[in-house]
Every structure is written in C-alpha cells, then in structure tokens.
Amino acid sequence: MENRYRIVCPFSFDFFDGYWRNFRDSGTDEPVMRLSLEAKNVDLYGTETLPVYDGGKAFRVSDSVLCVNRDFTEGKICGNSDDIQGIYGCAMVALYGNLIRRDTLVMHSSMIECNGEAILFTGPSGVGKTTQAELWNEHRGARIVNGDMVFIHKDDDGRFYACGSPWHGSSEYCLNVKLPIKAIVTPIKSDECRIEAVSGMEMLRRVFPEVMLPDWFDGCKELGMSTLDGLLKSVPVYKLECTKDIRAVEALEMKLG
C-alpha cells in the first residue's frame, strides 16, 4: 500500500513505540488521512468539549474519543496519554474507516513470508495460528510478519497483497512488509494432519468471521464485502487439520507445491 498516514502528537505520548516505529514514514507526499492526538478538554464542572466535523461522527473506545470527518480523511483522538488501549483503538477506527474505501480489509491472522509470498493462518483465538507460523519459522526459515492483525489490499495490478500492520495483539511479531498472497489457511487442532481446499459456504464460514466488516458509515460493510468477495475468488483457502510439529508444515508444503 502506497498510502501514507501521518500522526501528530501535541502532548507527551510516544505513540510510535518499538513496533510502531517500523511503520514510521518520512515521505513528503500529501497524506490521505491526517489524524491528531490531543489531551481531553474537561472543564471544572466535568463537561468535556469535543471537536466537531460537519457530517462526521464520534467513536468512543475505552476512555478515548475519535472525532472524524465524513470521509475519514481527517480526525482527532481526544484522550489521556495513559489510555493506550483507547488511543490505539481509536487509531484503528480512523485508519480502517479510510482503508476500507481503498479496497483494503483487516483480517485476524498470522502472516508468514515464504519464498517472497505470504501465507495467512486465520481463525479464532487459540486455534493455533501463531503456532503454525512459528513451526514454519523453525523448520523452513519463514519470516513471521505479524501474529495477529494483517491488512489485505487489492493493488492496481488486480492482485491481493498482505501487509503487516502496527496492531499485533499480544504477539511480538510486527514487521512492515507487503507481499502477494499465496494462500489463506484455517488451522484446526488435530492428532493427524489432513489438508483440503475449501470453497462455497464452508470457505465463507471459515474466513468471514475473521475479517473486520464494520458499519461505521453508509455503505461501509458493503464496501468490505465487495473486497472480500474479490479476495475469495482470487486466493485459495485451505482447511488444515494439524498437529503442533513438522508434520503440519510438510502437509501444507506438499499441498502448496
């Protein structure tokens, strides 16, 4: 993704932590979104003042509030510097409200790089996404890009690319990498290893719950569904019944060729 996002922090708060610094950009191109962070404005009567954008909306995450304009190109996060969860959550709302208009999805998944392409392990928390990613790292030297949240973008060439994101959950994996997607894999814990391609309703049932499809503005969810439909028509999806050892790597490797 070539879009640039600029974050301005007018009070002491290191928004760009060790992981966020991987995504810092020093380019001079005009940004597609401006997002600023300011301290809450609460008077002595406990009344809070928030900025207002004509036709825009306000979103509360934890103790922070995001006020954003109609097309999600400009916004302000009002919060205290110690509300990390709220500030990061508001930033995600602002960013994704912009990206979903640009053929981009957010998928709950672990992303690895193998031979210049991305393999995405997706599924509910605890299913073994990061475990499978780490097995590929251990046995095949695959690089783990992100262990929790991945951007998926349809580029100008019509291909779908997976992009590392600054949001990484409890995972320590958080790299700024963009790769064409080779496959989406839905792991299931098992005593044996079996893999098969899935399609139709089963494919949708396995992937749909892991894609963030908000309803923040008119047509928002429909935009996301359109991009998801294109993704599932372009990228193979596999169900991997797997163990927590090298056999799982070998089974998937054989299937992918």
Model-derived regions, located:
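Hydrophobic positions on the alpha1 helix immediately C-terminal to the Walker A/P-loop
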Residues: Q132
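Conserved lysine of the Walker
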Residues: K129
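A noncatalytic interaction/capping subdomain that flanks phosphate/NTP-handling catalytic cores
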Residues: M1-S125, L135-V145, V150-G257
